[in-house]
Amino acid sequence: MSEQKKVVLAYSGGLDTSVAIKWLQEQGYNVIACCLDVGEGKDLAFVQQKALEVGATNSYVIDAKEEFAQDYALISLQAHTMYEGKYPLVSALSRPLIAKKLVEIAEKEDAQAIAHGCTGKGNDQVRFEVSIKSLNPDLEVIAPVREWQWSREEEIEYAASRGIPIPINLDSPYSIDQNLWGRANECGILEDPWAAPPEGAYDLTAPLEKTPDTPEVIEIAFEQGVPVSIDGVSYSLSELILKLNEMAGAHGVGRIDHVENRLVGIKSREVYECPGAMTLIKAHKELEDLTLVKEVAHFKPIIEQKMSEIIYNGLWFSPLKDALHAFLKETQKHVTGIVRVKLFKGHAIVEGRKSEYSLYDEKLATYTKDDAFDHHAAIGFIELWGLPTKVNSIVKKKEQIKA
């Protein structure tokens, strides 16, 4: 008798992946569950036990918050990744890390396959499967939800017939994904792009009507592009991001309502909450404005846009992403300093920045008697700078005379 095949399942503890355990067993697999906490606050012990009770032969739970912060969210921060100028890549950032852990466990357990709970309509199926195949091309990838194509009612009926616990929040109209970089929400009334998102769709941010009437001013310190403290108190990166989620979220910072172009070819209306991410990106950009030379500052946004597209499109483990990341790391060597930010009524407003590597020279910028700028040097500069345009104009006038 041949040995039963093994599959590692990306397990969330919800209905879809709980049903997937039983379904995969019925397809002849031993199911090994794997759940990561990337900052959404999962009860890992509960999820681990639930997977075993549903039928998994083994259940891994991994606290990956700091790894996610250091190796994934930090790249998003330093690259100011804003897909289509609005979305700081919440879900897109966690998928490659989850895929990496799934592959590691599959190799450890000698599993032949990896399974995920994505539908055939979203971006995540692409991100998971491209990442998995990039890391180990020999692993089979199974997508139970995409394969069975059941209605919600059929799925519940299947679960009930096999004794699978049905979550108490099943009646929620929303589909939510969350990590320390933010919260993504879709479905329900949000599918109508004209409908205003109800307050029930939000969790990390306060409505403007209920935010404090007094601004909160904070100071964020960076070392080589990495945020290290708030108001002089040091934190690990994951702790700092979560702390800023609380602080900025209380002031309503970071709400994003976005009709985006999905990788699979459709438009989708998403509501995001990214209070910590949006505050950090704004502060980091202001510190770069102080410390990067003009040529790098003007070229970097081109890299940022491409990096945003690559990550959104599931190409985290691509050679191009690695090459762009190498450029990015080079730009961060002198992005060290402190940024003062005012949090107030949905805004994170930068009010000051300072750095030992500042390229701002007040004596060159001032219009007072302390002005050290050589105004006479401007005469020759203007002549040479405008020379090509001047020559072009002279030639055109000669052509007009001939005509």
Curated annotation (Swiss-Prot):
Protein name: Argininosuccinate synthase
GO molecular function list: argininosuccinate synthase activity; ATP binding
Catalysed reactions, as listed in the record: L-citrulline + L-aspartate + ATP = 2-(N(omega)-L-arginino)succinate + AMP + diphosphate + H(+)
GO cellular component assignments: cytoplasm
KW Ligase (keyword) present: yes
Binding site for L-citrulline: Y87, N123, R127, S175, E260, Y272
UniProt-listed HAMAP family: Arg_succ_synth_type1 (MF_00005)
Primary enzyme class: ligase
Keyword Nucleotide-binding attached: yes
